Amino acid sequence: LFEEDFLKKFLLLLGAVVIVFGLLAAPFYIFAKMADGEVARRSLGEGDHNSLKHGLAAAELYATLRPVLGSDYAADLTIVIGEMVEVIEQHTKHETDVAREVYKDLHNNLYGVVAARWMEGAGGSNDRQSRLRLVGWLAETDALADWAEDKRVPESLPWTPDIDAALAAADTDRPRLEAEFRAHLDAHRHDIAADLALAAK
């Protein structure tokens, strides 16, 4: 009886964890349609769709968690969830992503988070449409990494599946990339403001 009761509680807890993770990970799948619209509006290519989708999903998940967890914790949790999604996809996708592809996705996730945080301090609008337009601008100006061949993906990463190597490289590079992303956004503040204003018309 004790074992049966324990098993029920364990299964309920496991189910709750799966549901919570599913809700948190959902942005990495449900924003594809919004990305489609922005890709079409800007006449972007195939690679831009994936990079824009990752950047937007991370930005939106961060923006959702931010009021509850605060900026730093929301950013960290968004990055961790993005990494967990990549780990799960290693076991569920028909074609397993190579390490360079995984790093590329994590690079774009991080840029989405940094962009959303940057908008909070930029003094402008910080709604979903503005975040979409900002990530779209990043895709259009090649700030996001489109392909595994991108020069911003470390040459040391293999062209074979190696999730551990990709995660380790992304974690190591995160402080440097965050600083570079913020500097890029600051340097192009006026271009971004003009692009968002034009898109809003």
Per-segment meaning from a language model:
Residues 110-115:
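Functionally important transmembrane alpha-helices
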Residues 105:
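Divalent metal-coordination and catalytic microenvironments
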